[in-house]
Swiss-Prot record:
SUPFAM superfamilies: ARM repeat
Phenotype when changing residue 675 to R: Disrupts interaction with VPS29. Does not effect interaction with VPS26
Similarity comment: Belongs to the VPS35 family.
Impact noted for substituting residue 469 to P: Found in a consanguineous family with intellectual disability; uncertain significance
Effect of residue 316 to S: Found in a patient with Parkinson disease
Protein name as annotated: Vacuolar protein sorting-associated protein 35
Cellular component terms (Gene Ontology): cytosol; dopaminergic synapse; early endosome; endosome; endosome membrane; extracellular exosome; glutamatergic synapse; intracellular membrane-bounded organelle
Amino acid sequence: MPTTQQSPQDEQEKLLDEAIQAVKVQSFQMKRCLDKNKLMDALKHASNMLGELRTSMLSPKSYYELYMAISDELHYLEVYLTDEFAKGRKVADLYELVQYAGNIIPRLYLLITVGVVYVKSFPQSRKDILKDLVEMCRGVQHPLRGLFLRNYLLQCTRNILPDEGEPTDEETTGDISDSMDFVLLNFAEMNKLWVRMQHQGHSRDREKRERERQELRILVGTNLVRLSQLEGVNVERYKQIVLTGILEQVVNCRDALAQEYLMECIIQVFPDEFHLQTLNPFLRACAELHQNVNVKNIIIALIDRLALFAHREDGPGIPADIKLFDIFSQQVATVIQSRQDMPSEDVVSLQVSLINLAMKCYPDRVDYVDKVLETTVEIFNKLNLEHIATSSAVSKELTRLLKIPVDTYNNILTVLKLKHFHPLFEYFDYESRKSMSCYVLSNVLDYNTEIVSQDQVDSIMNLVSTLIQDQPDQPVEDPDPEDFADEQSLVGRFIHLLRSEDPDQQYLILNTARKHFGAGGNQRIRFTLPPLVFAAYQLAFRYKENSKVDDKWEKKCQKIFSFAHQTISALIKAELAELPLRLFLQGALAAGEIGFENHETVAYEFMSQAFSLYEDEISDSKAQLAAITLIIGTFERMKCFSEENHEPLRTQCALAASKLLKKPDQGRAVSTCAHLFWSGRNTDKNGEELHGGKRVMECLKKALKIANQCMDPSLQVQLFIEILNRYIYFYEKENDAVTIQVLNQLIQKIREDLPNLESSEETEQINKHFHNTLEHLRLRRESPESEGPIYEGLIL
C-alpha cells in the first residue's frame, strides 16, 4: 500500500519531535550523571544532546524551539559547574578538556558554558576568555547554526561583560572598550551569516528564505540592544566607536533587508541624546544604502522620534548648538539626490516629516515650514509634475503636507505668510483643490478667524478660487447638487468673517470680495452674493452708529446702497427673481431705518425694484402670493415715505393683490392689504398710523366679494372665516367702520354654509377654525372689563 506524502509542516513537526525526544533522553542521562558526580559522563551526554543542533533539516522556527529546549538544559549544567568550582574543582583543566569534543557545534556550546563559569569564578581571566570565545565561534560558518551559536554566546556573557564603575584590574579583566569590541565583532559576524542566508538553496525558494531571514533578524538586532545597555557607552564612545562600527558593517553588507532593519534598530535602541549628536554620520549612511532600501521610512522614524523628544514637557529639548532642522533639510536633500528612482510619494513623505519636525521643534519659525514647501515645489518642478491626480499616492501625501500647517496654526492668516503654500496648492487637480479649499475654509470657520484687510481677502479668494469661480480643468458634467450646495454654503458662511474694525476698510473688503464672487457664474452667486448684501446693510448701520464722529457718513451710506443695488442686480441677470426681491425689500427696510440723506429716494427705488421683479419675473401663482405678501408686510413696517410716495405704493399693492390669478389668492392678498390703510405710516402724519377705516372696509368687502366668486364651497367658507378674523382684528383696533352688524352677518353666512360641506379632514379643520374664532368672541363678550371695544349685540 503506497504511503501518503507528508506536508512540509507535518514533516517539520515530526523532525522537531524526534530531536526534542533525543534531547530529553540525553539531558536526563546528563542530570543523572551530575547527581552522581560523574562529570565526564555528564559532558558526554551533554555533547550528544548538543549534537542535535548540527541538523540542517529544521526550519528557523523549529530550530529555535530546539535551541531553547537545549539552552534550558545547559543552564542546569552551568549551575552545577559553578557550584563545583566554588568547592575548589579546577576550571582550567575542564576548559582545556571540552575543546577535545568530537564535533565543533557541541564543542563550542560547551566551551561557552564552561568559559562563562570560568570567568565568574576567576574574573582575572575574563579578557582572554571573551576574546577566545568570540574568535572560536568563527569555526561555524553555516548561517543558521552560526547565528544561534553566537546568540548563545551573547546571552551567556550578558552579565559578565566589563562595564563602567567596576573595581577591576583592566589589564586582565578588560574594560568597556573590550566589551564594545566583543559585541561589535559578534554583531559583524552574525550579520555576515544572516546576509549569507539569502544565497543558500535553490533560487525558486528565494521568497521562503527571505521570510526565514525576517524571522531571524531579532538575533542580529540583540547585539545592538546589548551595546545600548552598557553604561560605559557614553555619547563620545557611541559617536567614535559604536556607531562607526555598526554603520560600517551596515553599509558594507549591501543587503537591503539587513540595512533597513539595522538602521531602524539603531533608531529604536539608542537614546535620543545620542542621535542628536550623530545626525550627520547617520544620515550620510542613509544616502549610501542599497537602492532597494526604503530610506524614507528610516529617516521618518528618526525625525518623528526626535520631534517627540523635542516636544516632551519633561525633556531638556533640542540643544541650541544643534541646528536640527538645517541638518535634516540638507541630508534629506542629499538622500533624494542620491536616489533618482525614489517614488514621488516617498519624496513628499520625507517633506511631511520635515514639516512636522519644524512645527514641533521650532513652532515660531514660519520660515522653516516655508522652506519645506519651497523644496517640495522645486522637486515637483524637476519631476515636471502637473495636476496631480486625486487618486494618486503623491496627492495623498501632498494633502497631508498641506494640512499640517492648516491644522497646527489654526489661523489662515499665518498660513498665508507661507509664500510657497499657494504655488504647491496649484499642483493638485481640480477635485483635490476643491477638497483642500473646503478644508481650509472649514478651518477658518471652526476657529472664527477674522479677515481684516483687502490683501488678506485677495489672498484667500485666490487660494480657494476653485470654490469661487469656474476652473479650466473642472469636469464637463454638472456637480452633485447637494455637494455643490454644501461647498457654496461654506463660502457663504465665510463672508461673515470678512470683518474690519474700520468701516471704510470694511467697505473696501466687501468690494474686493464682490470682484471675486461676481465672476462665480449664475450657479454660485445665489449662495455667495446674498451674504455680501447683508454684510453691506450691516455696514450701513455701523456708519449710522458712527454719525457723530464721521461727517461723511450719509454719503458713505448712499455708496453702500448703490453697492447693494449693483450686487442684487447681478442676481437678477442670473435669472433669479425671488432672492433679489427679498434683498431689495430688506434694503428698503434698512434705508428707511437708517435715515440718511436721500434715504426716502433709495427706499422708494428698492421698493420699486421689488415691484418690477414681482410683475416681470415671477409667474408661478404660489410664488406670486408669497411675494406680494412679503411686499405688503415690508411696506407696512416702513415709515420713511411721504404721502406723495406712500399713496402710489399702497395703491400698487392693492392693485397687484387684486390681479392675482387664483381667486383664493386674490382674496387673501386683498384682505392683507387692508393693514396698509390702517397701520401704514408716512412722514406727513409724523410717523403715526393712517387709520383709514373706510379704505380698510373697502379692502375687506372686496375680499368678501372675491371669496363669494370661489367655486369650491369648502375653500369659500375657509376664506370667509379668514376674512371674519380680519374684521375682528380691525374691530378690536377700534375701526369705527367695522360694526357688530357686519360681524353678525358674516357669522350667520358661515353658519349657513358650514353644514353643506362634505365630511372630510379639511372640513374638520374649517370647523375647528370657526369654533376657535367664536370662542375668542365669546371670551371677549363675557369679559367687558378687558381692554378694547364691547361686543354688545353680537349673536353667537
